Amino acid sequence: MADSTADESTNADTLWRELHKVLPEIWYDGGGKDHCEIDEAIRILTCLRKIESKNPESDISPVEVPKEFICTLSNKIMIEPMLIASGQTFEKSYILEWLKHERTCPRTKQVLYHRFMIPNHLINEVIKEWCLIHNFDRPKTSDEVIDLFTGDLESLLQRISSPSSVEDQTEAAKELALKAKRFSSVCVYFVAKIPDSITRLLTPLSISEDSNPEFLENIVTALHIFSTSEKNKTLVAENPLVLPLLAKYMKQGTVLTRIHSAATVNSLSYTDSNKIIIGNSEVLKALIHVIEEGDSLATSEAFSALSNLCPVKEISEKAVSEGLIRAAIKKIKAGSNVSMLLSLLAFVSTQNHQTTEEMDNLGLIYDLFSILRNSNSLVNDENAVVIVYNICKSYKALQNVVLREEKRDVVLEEENKHGTFTRLENQEAGRATSLAKRILEWILR
């Protein structure tokens, strides 16, 4: 009896060695090129099942899952093996998530000529046989969200917050920004699942002298991308490091740093609960600085942020007191970002009529006349005439009769020389036509 058991043990060892020779051939040929190898694997597994059934005590020892049964994406035994164009097999839910973002095979790195996949029934049968022999409880399919690209986020953050060298820190920041840009799951996971992730990400910026522009660009870029996820907006805005650093880097740093800093504020400003937080911070003044001094892209982001914030009257009043009107008019006079800034000034002048005095003192009305004479945009026409109308309302309210008549004459002269408001009245272009008519009624009375 002892000899028989020993023989069976020897046979089992031999069979396992044979199986481990066959499995790689099946896997790396895609599991479907040679059915003889599949049949051989099933034959070996059937023999093993017979041997194991005579030695139930062997089931007690722990079982190591063959690496060929493990999906390289999930690092778990496959439940629904799927064959892709490269001939490689992966767990269904993981390869589906991978192919949402990638056009390459995770194992071979070759570019896939299509993203179709089919169930690998042959490999599935081999795994089922193995599980039966070892009484291995194969997991059921799950609706669990796949965090496929998040495995190295903690190590990247560690390299950023506790760097071994400046070069490695910069490279880690670059990798993090690229990951965040490519995979939406990374954005949510980084902020929600990694403890103190935003603080750890930004701490190097709060203690450094900004001597590494590339590192700074990548960190601010990553922060911008994290802020675009709806789930992250409040958590990011409420972090005490975020807004002071964004305010700082809207005023200094590279062009890209300024653009991404303004874009981050813009992204955060879409959430109502963030508006008061932003309005009460130094970010508001920094946005106005970007409007006045920034390039076109940064100005566009700052404009969008202010458009989100200024409907809150307290924030609008603060923005005006911080120099919004002067900054916007400076850009309009320079011919930069005219359309968006006209839109902003039209809103502000309607919301707060006291702003029209500053607009008038800065000579904006002459720029508006020029825009109305030369514009091919109905939107610009409407916004420009809204501002002119609001300025005229402030003229009409003047107590000094002489000054009031002088101001009226300025508008009348424009009409007499160029017929600006008559042309607008005849356009039948909605609000612009209506306001032009009112202006004409006042100046031609």
UniProtKB/Swiss-Prot annotation:
Top-rank EC class of the record's enzyme: transferase
Keyword list, A-Z: Transferase, Ubl conjugation pathway
Annotated metabolic or biological route of this protein: Protein modification; protein ubiquitination
Limits of the U-box domain: 64-137
Known catalytic reactions: S-ubiquitinyl-[E2 ubiquitin-conjugating enzyme]-L-cysteine + [acceptor protein]-L-lysine = [E2 ubiquitin-conjugating enzyme]-L-cysteine + N(6)-ubiquitinyl-[acceptor protein]-L-lysine
Enzyme nomenclature, EC number: 2.3.2.27
Domain of life: Eukaryota
Gene Ontology molecular functions: ubiquitin-protein transferase activity
UniProt KW Cell inner membrane keyword: no
UniProt keyword Transferase present: yes
Ranges in coiled-coil conformation: none
SMART domains, alphabetized: Ubox (SM00504)
InterPro entries, alphabetized: ARM-like, ARM-type_fold, RING-Ubox_PUB, Ubox_domain, Znf_RING/FYVE/PHD
Any one biological process term the GO annotation gives: protein ubiquitination
Task of the protein: Functions as an E3 ubiquitin ligase.
Protein name: Putative U-box domain-containing protein 47
The organism of origin for this protein: Arabidopsis thaliana
